[in-house]
Amino acid sequence: MKIKVGILGASGYAGNELVRILLNHPKVEISYLGSSSSVGQNYQDLYPNTPLNLCFENKNLDELELDLLFLATPHEFSAKLLNENLLKKMKIIDLSADFRLKNPKDYELWYKFTHPNQELLQNAVYGLCELYKEEIKKASLVANPGCYTTCSILSLYPLFKEKIIDFNSVIIDAKSGVSGAGRSAKVENLFCEVNENIKAYGLASHRHTPEIEEHLSYAAKEKITLQFTPHLVPMQRGILISAYANLKEDLQEQDIRDIYTKYYQNNKFIRLLPPQSLPQTRWVKSSNFADINFSVDQRTKRVIVLGAIDNLIKGAAGQAVQNMNLMFDFDEDEGLKFFANL
């Protein structure tokens, strides 16, 4: 028997990837596409490549007969929309940032709004499947992680958990394809602006910083602060992070490889690459995999960690489906058994 799901925000890039994955999921039926601006429009008119003959509607959510609702909506939207009564009717996976951070003050500082739903904020489960699998299985509200945060946390988590690095020395240099900026028309995202150009943005102010720090602090069991700098690169999709940290002791590469293997050997979507094989975005494109590898610089006593994901899949829609699979006791990789087409 298939579960019935709905999507708010299916017109965006992450929303469209969600539709694409769910259409091929054997245990899911897409029953509702919600929109306030495209009511009556057929989804195929918006995305002719997508075989979904379903029109957008604008119903009161309390009227919907769904098992699960995905929210691929702008920040602040779901924080105002969700309530306990709705969560008694259906499960929710929120792809926005509205329920990712536990401290309400972080929303005022980083997102510039006062969170209106602080009780639900505390009850939401952070949907990074490889770290919080058991909590996700029991959750009614899952906050799907951000794209940069997914790649950064997964790449560094074992090092923080084992406390083998100087936490105050961590620097993350991240690069993302343009789809990470969303589908809305913006001058800075036009072809002539991004083609043959790489630029940094959000210096010391990117909104994913507190999310990364929060969950690596949980791993370290102490408050940590790190440096995170993102860059926009002229490709459609993909994230590559290069992270640097000082080692606390004289460790060899095999020592660190043993640590990563300890944490990730049983995970279906994390691939610890062989020695000397460095992650590339094309190897994870359109897949739910996270590729990770590292090198130890014996001269500087630093570990250099590389991680790669597809920002729209493992960084958004694929991870949302992975969360759904856990919440409904499906195989974790159901509907996600695809890999990069080189």
Curated annotation (Swiss-Prot):
Keywords: Amino-acid biosynthesis, Arginine biosynthesis, Cytoplasm, NADP, Oxidoreductase
Main location: cytoplasm
Molecular function terms from GO: N-acetyl-gamma-glutamyl-phosphate reductase activity; NAD binding; NADP+ binding
UniProt cross-references to CDD domains, sorted A to Z: AGPR_1_C, AGPR_1_N
Residues of the active site: 147
GO cellular component, one term: cytoplasm
Domain of life: Bacteria
Reaction(s) this enzyme catalyzes, per UniProt: N-acetyl-L-glutamate 5-semialdehyde + phosphate + NADP(+) = N-acetyl-L-glutamyl 5-phosphate + NADPH + H(+)
GO biological process assignments: L-arginine biosynthetic process
SMART domains the UniProt entry points to: Semialdhyde_dh
Pathway: Amino-acid biosynthesis; L-arginine biosynthesis; N(2)-acetyl-L-ornithine from L-glutamate: step 3/4
Subcellular location(s) of the protein: Cytoplasm
Keyword Zinc-finger belongs to the record: no
EC number: 1.2.1.38
Family: Belongs to the NAGSA dehydrogenase family. Type 1 subfamily.
Function field: Catalyzes the NADPH-dependent reduction of N-acetyl-5-glutamyl phosphate to yield N-acetyl-L-glutamate 5-semialdehyde.
Name recorded for this polypeptide: N-acetyl-gamma-glutamyl-phosphate reductase
Organism listed in the record: Campylobacter jejuni subsp. jejuni serotype O:6 (strain 81116 / NCTC 11828)
